[in-house]
A protein has these predicted regions:
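Charge-dense, helix-prone N-terminal extensions
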Residues: 2-167
């Protein structure tokens, strides 16, 4: 009987982890939510304006219309990836989100010239694939444009898509 309870408990634990992984996966899927309504809901006016500026910048670079990826990521375009581990999925080619008081721009972790560009950006912090910017007024806006363009080039090189004729 005790073994049965442990087995059931272990099975429930595995089911919970699978459910959490599934829910986590669903958060990064495109949604039907309007990007403009998402941005309009940002309480701080300067952050709303910064988000609109990033939409214009990324639209110009990607030549794609924005769409919501999950509840908070504004993404442009998409690509399919598959890791050596076998894990695969879809992601936005270019994306940003408001995280608290900062804009987070998502870029590839390593591409030629990334560190040089980040040094020219202005006031920011970085994570592995994130660039945290408190205010766009504190950065040279030509740099995020170049960062996004180079990140997209690197992504397309690393994950060629079958429908892009080798691009």
């Amino acid at each position: 009987m005790l073994i049965g309870r442990r087995s059931r408990s272990a099975a429930l634990g595995v089911e919970k982890k699978l459910l959490e992984a599934h829910v986590s996966e669903l958060k990064t899927k495109p949604t039907e939510v309007s990007v403009e309504s998402h941005i309009a809901a940002i309480a701080n006016e300067e952050q709303r304006n910064d988000a609109r500026t990033l939409v214009a910048l990324m639209r110009r670079v990607t030549k794609q219309e924005p769409m919501m990826w999950g509840p908070s990521i504004v993404g442009f375009g998409s690509y399919h990836y598959k890791y050596a581990s076998g894990h695969e999925g879809d992601s936005a080619l270019a994306a940003f989100a408001m995280r608290g008081s900062e804009l987070v721009v998502y870029i590839e972790a390593s591409f030629e010239g990334r560190d040089v560009l980040l040094a020219k950006l202005g006031k920011h912090k970085t994570g592995k694939v994130c660039v945290y910017i408190r205010r766009l007024a504190n950065v040279d806006l030509t740099v995020p444009e170049t960062l996004v363009a180079r990140s997209i080039e690197d992504t397309k090189r690393r994950y060629p898509q079958p429908n892009e004729n080798g691009a």
